[in-house]
């Protein structure tokens, strides 16, 4: 079975384009970006994952006490994932 990374190798490495200017993305890992608002505050993280049906975007927040990420939601659209981190 062919993985999505083999079909679209550059797709997972590019920074997702956001339609809104309220936040921007700073790379934090291979498939991970920090979501930063206009004031420079980190709202959370956006992780790109491969799904058999296409690219999915996970909105996550770092839980400092445990050192792990907490899933906020998983979306088909990067803007929807970023919007979930605004609240």
Which positions does each model-derived feature cover?
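Well-ordered beta-strand positions in beta-sheet-rich domains
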Residues: 22, 45, 72-74
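A generic structural signal for ordered secondary structure
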Residues: 32, 46, 77-78
């Amino acid at each position: 079975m062919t993985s999505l990374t083999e079909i679209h190798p550059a797709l997972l490495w590019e920074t997702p384009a956001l339609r809104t200017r309220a936040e921007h993305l700073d790379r934090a890992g291979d498939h991970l970006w920090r979501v930063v608002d206009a004031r420079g505050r980190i709202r959370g993280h956006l992780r790109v994952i491969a799904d058999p049906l296409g690219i999915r975007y996970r909105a996550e927040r770092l839980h400092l006490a445990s050192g792990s990420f907490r899933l906020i939601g998983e979306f088909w659209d990067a803007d929807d994932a970023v919007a979930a981190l605004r609240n």
